[in-house]
Amino acid sequence: YGEIYVLSFKMFLDNPITGIGINNFKYLCNNNKQYKNMMVNYNCASHPHNIYIQWLTEGGLIVLILFIIYLFSIVGFIIKNEGNKKYKIISLVIILTMFWPIMSTGSLIKNWYGIITFFILGICVCLSRFKNNL
């Protein structure tokens, strides 16, 4: 994924504040000669294959910062609520695993990966609120 990440970072540097637009990665990669030439070993991908790089490339700094604030607010909610400590720890470990920053991922925007991710995130929030053992 090295070529994809380098291309993504170049796209971000060209549009740092607002990004290239949501779901525009593949379109811009295929239709911009400079970007297409950066993909030597692979064809243009549909997305950058990392959720943080995707938000940075497609949404710019604004969207990446909002996404990180969103994740921290969920983690803060789980830590502060009065649920069972064991379930809170399980929820936090699951979230940390799902949103590990250096992991290759699917797109959160346009495929099943996003549906599953946000479903599991909701389950983790609910699980962390249980006060007694199940």
Which positions does each model-derived feature cover?
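Long extracytoplasmic/lumenal interhelical loops at the membrane interface
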Residues: 2-14, 18-59
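Domain-wide signal for the mature, well-folded portions of proteins, strongly enriched
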Residues: 9, 29, 48, 52-53, ...
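Short glycine-rich loop/turn motifs that provide flexible caps or phosphate-binding loops at active sites
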Residues: 18-20, 59-62, 113, 121
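Short, flexible micro-motifs
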Residues: 22-26, 63-66, 109, 117, ...
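Hydrophobic transmembrane alpha-helices and their immediate junctions
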Residues: 35, 58-99
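Transmembrane alpha-helices of multi-pass inner-membrane enzymes
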Residues: 91-103, 107-134
